[in-house]
Amino acid sequence: MTAADPDDIAKQAREHAWNWFALHATQRMQALNFFVVATAFLIAAYASILEKHPAAAAVLALAGAWLTFWFNRLDARSYQLVEAGEDALRVSQARLASLADNQSLMILDALDEPAPGASSYRRVITVIQSTIFALFLLGALYAIRLSLM
């Protein structure tokens, strides 16, 4: 039995880490896109039934808030999976930077903190989802108020 080539193992590790990262980062953006589209449909439905059926609009708004909550939880998990891929890629980047004698190849380490004035994806997604959650709740309260008049 021959010993495994360390360079081959390092290459396999890098490919595995990259595939993991790419899969979960793509899924995260697709989930966000689906959330935005679903939110647009819910808002359109809410607006179209609000005047004639305010109780139904309230239920729809509460369903939107509920879905927003769960999309936020799903994004938190996706964030964790993406971070796991980044952690694995850091090792490959450190090895590559050392072999190439080029510390600029440690890209993830250089980008740990967003630039001044920039925000992380996690922060932006959370702010968007929190705002939509609050708007759905306010919409539900407004529809309930209309239904009681």
Give the ranges of each region predicted by the language model.
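A hydrophobic membrane-anchoring alpha-helix module
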Residues: M106-M149
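Membrane-water interface of alpha-helical transmembrane segments
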Residues: T26, Q30, E51-A58, S119-T126
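Intrinsically disordered, low-complexity segments enriched in polar/charged small residues
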Residues: M29, N33, S98, V127-I128, ...
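Inner-leaflet juxtamembrane helices
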Residues: A31, H53-L108
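Helical transmembrane-bundle signal
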Residues: A40-I43, G64-F71, I132-A143
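Membrane-interfacial hairpin junctions
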Residues: A44-A57, S147-M149
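Cytosol/matrix-facing amphipathic helices and coiled-coil assembly/linker segments
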Residues: M1-E51, F71, R77-Y79, A94-R95
